[in-house]
């Protein structure tokens, strides 16, 4: 070990969005950072498919809370505009109901008012009150709850924090809380389905997630030019500029521990890479089960952990464009509550709700001229012994096309030019090492948020840290970026306690030439 790197060597396991953002932040603070990733490129589940001129996002499809993305770049002395072009989606999305009615949601208040009054007379005034509550939930959560590390349960249960928890209505259930503002079941569904971004049911999730529809409608929905994969590309470029070294096609077989410390990692080929600390961006339950010696470390309540739902995905290259579709389209099944009950009781809904993404409405470069690259997400249960996705997958696919035919797209299946592949919970588990094929990581029910969620620092192995959707503060792209900030702060505290001497960069490095944004 050279004197220049003593105590500063960090190995990051995984090049997902959280690992990339944390690597850039740590390198900016003066750490010597290497990233090891099992696949051939960055992004994790925030990835893409490209075939014959069609481009599909593989996982996430929207950007919410742009201020969190801006802060990530600002923290290392950069401007997000030099790395990403964020395009606003407006109208935000259209929601289709089983009675063949629909509502187009927009951030433009007058237009939104007309849509709401058409469905439920008198609802616009209550909608404004709903947005006002959502703004309080949004700002309070970001500024006082989600955006900080907790020293422990006592810290979380302090009078100051408890007051904030009640202020954001985390003690209430989201569907019940939203029902105070809207009487029409269609609007109640349209204002609560956003919990599926987190893979949880609005009937079981805290009402604080009312911040999600506010974020969409009050702050806006955004889309990076080139698709969501532009985000990990930009973060990788940023990290490289800060001196981070990347090793792709390099699966980590084991995080090595000895005497209450980690000393690095062993790759599948047998090579040992020594480190002063390890930051794991692999899905946390998978890491504890597959990468760590259970005798050396512990994950409390592991057998009681609850997981989010998963998704059955279709990536369709179409022979033509469908002007009836917006960029974001949500289609509800007949029984809104029943579909959530089915998913979380490990049944595939008979009449599923689903989401259709048509990104050429915002970025025409994602498909050949006059054609559409459609992304379809059908929420389904995560892996379960009673579900065989070789059997269930084709059934879900057939239900999707049948429902689209009812909506006025009878030739959709015959219009397919390229069908790259479908993704099931089995694929999410196999490709991205997601425990149980759970597409969004650990659930964010009340018993798995705040300090009840697995910590970003192991309790026994003090130089082992975690970043990503299954650690604090939670799932979703902006939350994972906050996770990267929080674990950097936690790791900095650890390093200072060890007497590590750091020399943070005080000015932005010169951008690398020839590195794709």
UniProtKB/Swiss-Prot annotation:
EC number(s) recorded for this UniProt protein: 1.3.99.29
PROSITE patterns xref list: PHYTOENE_DH
Pathway it works in: Carotenoid biosynthesis; lycopene biosynthesis
Catalytic activity: 15-cis-phytoene + 2 A = all-trans-zeta-carotene + 2 AH2
MF terms in GO: oxidoreductase activity, acting on the CH-CH group of donors
Cofactor(s) recorded in Swiss-Prot or TrEMBL: FAD
GO process terms (BP): carotenoid biosynthetic process
Binding site for FAD: 11-44
Top-level EC class as recorded in UniProt: oxidoreductase
InterPro entries registered for this protein in UniProt: Amino_oxidase, Carotenoid/retinoid_OxRdtase, FAD/NAD-bd_sf, Phytoene_DH_bac_CS
Keyword tags: Carotenoid biosynthesis, FAD, Flavoprotein, NAD, Oxidoreductase
Family: Belongs to the carotenoid/retinoid oxidoreductase family.
PANTHER family xref list: PHYTOENE DESATURASE (PTHR43734:SF1)
Protein name: zeta-carotene-forming phytoene desaturase
Organism whose genome encodes this protein: Myxococcus xanthus
Source organism phylogeny: Bacteria, Pseudomonadati, Myxococcota, Myxococcia, Myxococcales
């Amino acid at each position: 070990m050279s004197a220049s790197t003593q105590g500063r060597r960090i190995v990051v396991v995984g090049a997902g969005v959280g690992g990339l953002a944390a690597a850039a932040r740590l390198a900016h603070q003066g750490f010597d950072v290497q990233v090891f990733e099992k696949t051939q490129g960055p992004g994790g589940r925030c990835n893409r498919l490209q075939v014959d001129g069609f481009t599909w996002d593989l996982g996430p499809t929207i950007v919410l809370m742009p201020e969190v993305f801006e802060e990530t770049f600002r923290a290392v002395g950069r401007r997000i505009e030099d790395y990403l072009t964020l395009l606003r989606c407006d109208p935000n999305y259209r929601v289709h109901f089983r009675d063949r009615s629909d509502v187009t949601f927009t951030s433009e208040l007058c237009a939104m008012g007309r849509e709401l009054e058409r469905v439920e007379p008198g609802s616009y005034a209550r909608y404004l009150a709903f947005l006002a509550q959502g703004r309080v939930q949004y700002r309070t959560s970001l500024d006082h709850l989600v955006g900080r590390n907790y020293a422990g349960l006592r810290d979380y249960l302090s009078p100051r924090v408890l007051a904030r928890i009640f202020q954001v209505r985390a003690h209430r259930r989201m569907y019940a809380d939203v029902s105070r503002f809207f009487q029409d079941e269609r609007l109640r569904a349209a204002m609560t389905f956003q919990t599926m971004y987190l893979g949880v049911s609005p009937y079981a999730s805290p009402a604080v997630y009312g911040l999600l529809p506010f974020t969409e409608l009050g702050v806006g929905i955004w889309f990076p030019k080139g698709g969501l994969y532009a985000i990990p590309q930009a973060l990788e470029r940023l990290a490289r500029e800060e001196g981070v070294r990347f090793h792709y096609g390099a699966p980590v077989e084991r995080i090595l521990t000895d005497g209450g410390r980690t000393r690095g990692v062993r790759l599948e080929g047998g090579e040992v890479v020594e480190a002063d600390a390890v930051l794991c961006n692999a899905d946390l339950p998978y890491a504890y089960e597959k990468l760590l010696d259970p005798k050396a470390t512990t994950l409390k309540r592991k057998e009681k952990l609850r997981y989010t739902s998963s998704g059955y995905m279709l990536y369709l290259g179409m022979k033509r464009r469908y002007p009836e579709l917006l960029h974001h389209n949500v289609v509800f099944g007949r029984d809104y509550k029943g579909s959530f009950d089915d998913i979380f009781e490990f049944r595939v809904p008979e009449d599923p709700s689903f989401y259709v993404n048509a990104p050429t409405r915002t970025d025409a470069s994602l498909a050949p001229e006059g054609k559409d690259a459609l992304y379809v997400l059908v929420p389904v249960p995560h892996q379960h012994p009673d579900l065989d996705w070789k059997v269930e997958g084709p059934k879900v696919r057939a239900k999707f096309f049948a429902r689209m035919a009812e909506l006025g797209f009878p030739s959709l299946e015959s219009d397919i030019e390229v069908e790259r592949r479908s993704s099931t919970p089995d694929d999410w588990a196999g490709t991205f090492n997601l425990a149980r094929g759970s597409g969004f990581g650990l659930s964010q029910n009340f018993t798995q948020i705040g300090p009840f969620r697995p910590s970003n620092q192991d309790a026994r192995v003090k130089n082992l840290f975690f970043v990503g959707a299954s650690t604090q503060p939670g799932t979703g792209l902006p939350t994972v970026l906050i996770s990267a900030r929080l674990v950097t702060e936690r790791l900095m505290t650890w390093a200072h306690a060890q007497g590590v001497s750091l020399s943070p960069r005080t000015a932005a490095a010169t951008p690398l030439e020839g590195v794709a944004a």
